[in-house]
Design a protein with these regions (language model features):
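Hydrophobic alpha-helical segments of integral membrane proteins
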Residues: 1-8, 147, 173
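A single, central transmembrane helix in multi-pass transporters
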Residues: 6-69
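C-terminal transmembrane bundle of multi-pass solute transporters/carriers
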Residues: 42-217
């Protein structure tokens, strides 16, 4: 484990930066959706508790289908999606929760709002999975085979540590802004877009590094 962390810190700081990007994504967007959607569906849309729980189950199903779709797209179009475009994926993924914030801001029919939330959740998870696949593939290509398992374990450890922190944070935030939950979603997507913009140069450099490694091979 020490060898893998030394490799990440000293030899390939790009891998550390990639890990921190995934962490930031989990902290800002994933945690917001994981905490916010159950609150919205079960408490803010006026459904009976049993109905609300069932409808949230459908939302989780849509998110799972989105993840599966993102995985399939990532497998089919892996060579066509460039790592330099990952910043764009991040930005679009962040914007995919904009409809959720909007339906909470306007007095739309409940079923219409629910369908929009479901579609947005599907798209967000599809793009998030696609982003994760592309970034993890890139990080694997930058890692020697002898360290691959250890380095990927470190990356997953770093990236997953942010999720419980984000959940605790959003638990408090949604409680404080319980009457205006759309504010939380607007804030999360804004930060997500900023993160995406700030990573444009990083992903371009990663693309160049990958080409350099491939040429050397």
């Amino acid at each position: 484990m020490k060898e893998s962390f030394n490799f990440i810190l000293n030899d390939r700081p790009e891998i550390l930066k990639g890990s921190l990007i995934i962490s930031a994504f989990n902290l800002v967007l994933s945690a917001c959706v994981m905490i916010g959607l159950p609150i919205i569906i079960t408490q803010k849309m006026g459904f009976q508790l049993e109905t609300a729980n069932r409808l949230y189950g459908y939302i989780e199903g849509a998110m799972g289908a989105g993840s599966l779709t993102g995985g399939i797209i990532g497998g089919i179009f892996a060579k066509k999606i460039k790592i330099k475009n990952c910043s764009l994926l991040l930005i679009i993924c962040s914007l995919s929760i904009l409809p959720i914030a909007l339906v909470l801001s306007f007095n739309l029919p409940v079923i219409t709002s629910y369908v929009i939330i479901m579609i947005s959740s599907f798209i967000m998870m599809m793009l998030a999975t696609l982003f994760s696949i592309q970034l993890m593939s890139c990080l694997q290509m930058l890692t020697p085979n002898k360290l691959l398992g250890k380095v990927i374990s470190c990356v997953m450890c770093i990236s997953m540590c942010a999720t419980p922190v984000g959940q605790a944070f959003y638990g408090m935030i949604f409680q404080k802004f319980s009457n205006i939950p759309q504010t939380v979603f607007f804030g999360a997507l804004s930060i997500g877009v900023i993160i995406g913009i700030c990573t444009i140069k990083l992903f371009r450099n990663l693309e160049e590094t990958m080409h350099t490694n491939y040429s050397e091979i």
